[in-house]
Amino acid sequence: MADLSYDKIEVGTEYGPWKYPLKERIARHLEAVENAHPWHHQRSPWGPPVAPPSILGNAALRFLDSIAPVPPGTLHAKHEIETAAALRLDRQPAGYGRFADKYEKRGRRWFVFETRWRDETGLIIGKSIVTMAFPSEQRTVNSDQEGRSQKSEIRERNGEMTPIVRALTQEKLTAYSEDSANALRGLSIHVQPEAAKKAGFETTVAQGLMSADYISEMMTSLLGKEWFENAKLSLASLRPVLSGETLTANGRLAESAPEGAVVRRTYEVWCENALGEAVTAGTATALVRPD
């Protein structure tokens, strides 16, 4: 199958339904991000165990792989994940996708891929929107510059949550990305060190969505069921994270506003490396019951 290309993307074209192999992948996914929350392994408030809401992000990338693999080194710039209902592990999720946009900006070519998800009963689970940039020689430079521009701002924030700390070993990176089209053909910058070095990195690079999983786990501990229903995670990737680094997820309440019978809470959330540099930052919002 030929790689995805900017010229061949047809904005608005619909794809799907495509079935994500949840039952086959969930154990490796949870292992990759070290998520031991009991709702994902034992009974949950919905009965059977459920998947982390953030899994819709990785499912969207595999859906994209089924259309055409992204060229190695494609930049994962932004990701939004909206949840409407919990995804039970005993049910089959199906995605419906489309290329929502493509454009040229700052000398690079970008595209936006949107997916909507239901389970086998027709229950709407949520949606995922990923923004990516095709490779260019300026990729690493731009990522570093964006990270430096956010560094001081993130340092000034005081995290108010119970942080999630994770060491990104190669074993974890492989477990997370081993089923990608590029990994299966030996071209993944997340799995194969040779591919990462060819792309200009010292070693393998963590998939940016791993930060989303850490933040989602943190929000699950904070909000419980309310993080699985009517919630949204919006994140930007600010700088690459290499194998061997340690990340810390944290956040703080930014706004709480009444919305009918419930309250909409907005949290500033981020992941930092050991130097205190932000690698991922954005917002998490959820509708919660009043205190």
Protein language model regions, located:
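A conserved acidic, glycine/proline-rich C-terminal tail/linker
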Residues: 230-234
